Amino acid sequence: MAKVKEAKNIWLDGKLIPWSEANVHILSHSLHYGNAVFEGVRAYQTKKGLAVFRLAEHTKRLLDSAKACLINVPYSYDELFKAQVELLKSNDFKDTVYLRPIVFLGYGSMGVSHLGSPVQVALAAWEWGAYMGEDAIEKGIKVKISSWAKNSPNSMMSKAKASANYFNSQMANHDAITSGYDEALLLDQQGFIAEGSGECFFIVRNGVIITPPNDTSLESITQNTVIEIAKDLGYEVKRERITRDEVYIADEAFFTGTAAEVTPITNVDGRIIGNGKMEAITKKLQKTYFATVRGENEKYEKYLRSEEHTSEL
């Protein structure tokens, strides 16, 4: 993955501070026991300036994740929303930006129980283009169905964007990359397709777009956006379980996510998907998605928070 490109400022516990001064104690509770929640948000350059895509939904999901994980966030929705806008304004960004809000447990107690641990909040933002590279967006990627199964919702908080959940993702992703693939695709505990290591999964069969329900995965904001776009374009969309063999015979396949955006999949387990290139429906969805996040589609302008709107805060 791409190296982080340092920016000017980071927001930490209510204050904007220089990037190089954003440090935490080595005995911070979350570093040892894994209880932290975070978000991934994108901001794009538009004709109205830098615009954040679906900031309201991402901020709400951050607070919902914290609630599920028994973390009492010391800031309100409005405070966090405004802080993210102010962070972007304080940095001189010229390209696509990735925002990473994180709520974690700091230094003050040790042991499995997190009771009494101070809650800290950090907001970071840096320029970050295509998650898997521009070639992935244009030509597609190779994916491996992982031997690692998705966490059971009876074992982890599957609806929370919790740091601990991503150990499972990390192991699956590592196995895929070291096996010569670009990304992993995980099955759920019943053997149906769940999601990628950090993306939602879609297939197209006979003109119908199919994506799994969020039974064992995060309720994805990007997945929701792409479904809305697809329906508006006149496509039939089904939310139903997908088997491994259905993937192999799909006409098209693609990942969606804040980082991944809309990334075509051309190969799964060494099997060519469709004609081995990005096909018509994926291409149409990708084109419309990028037009949406870049402020070129008035229909979805409601999802953008641009520099023009900051005076309203």
Which sequence ranges carry the predicted segments?
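Helix-start/capping segments and mature chain N-termini
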Residues: M1-Y75, E79-E86, M110-E307, S311
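Short secondary-structure junctions
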Residues: K89-V97, Y235
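Short, internal active-site loops enriched in acidic
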Residues: F104-S109
